[in-house]
Amino acid sequence: MSLQIGKPAPDFKGTAVVNGAFEEIKLADYKGKWVFLGFYPLDFTFVCPTEIVAFSEAASKFAERNAQVILTSTDSEYSHLAFINTPRKEGGLGGINIPLLADPSHKVSRDYGVLIEDAGVAFRGLFLIDPKGVLRQITINDLPVGRSVDEALRLLDAFQFVEEHGEVCPANWHKGSDTIDTKNPEKYFSKH
């Protein structure tokens, strides 16, 4: 499957751990919401818990923006549950506020182009899907470097601003900063 910005995101479905229980989820469950579908290599590793905890701690910020973060790895739902139930001081998550989707068949990771076939794990991909199911942004990191929650929120704010106002967001834009009206770009460029 080929991914393309501006085209429908690949459908996904599977068993996730949601609020400490197993639940079947799919992309269609989130129609009308923005979705960040994130991939990480493995439970019980080093960078992964830092990312999961950071996104979990920001869950309310995403919810305020009508967005849901879903993180997935090729681990089973049982591994996810054990990871969630293990205290942070012991290398676990100690409870989280976002779903962890299991992808033991590797289908979701493969469909999103992040699967490292010979290792059976995913690169650190982050995909922003709009409320209509359209893929709007892709970030893929190599395994040793984690992602920024602040940057994910900034991107979400920017895409939502563009949707609402029709103006475009320049480099390093943050909510409340000047944007560019494509019908009158001189207004922006005369000040910047």
Curated annotation (Swiss-Prot):
It is found in: Cytoplasm; Nucleus. One of its GO terms (molecular function) is unfolded protein binding. Its EC number is 1.11.1.24. The enzyme can be inactivated by further oxidation of the cysteine sulfenic acid (C(P)-SOH) to sulphinic acid (C(P)-SO2H) instead of its condensation to a disulfide bond. It can be reactivated by forming a transient disulfide bond with sulfiredoxin srx1, which reduces the cysteine sulfinic acid in an ATP- and Mg-dependent manner. This is Peroxiredoxin tpx1. Changing C48S: No nuclear accumulation of pap1. The active site is at C48. GO terms for cellular component: cytoplasm; cytosol; nucleus. It catalyses: a hydroperoxide + [thioredoxin]-dithiol = an alcohol + [thioredoxin]-disulfide + H2O. The keyword Secreted does not apply.
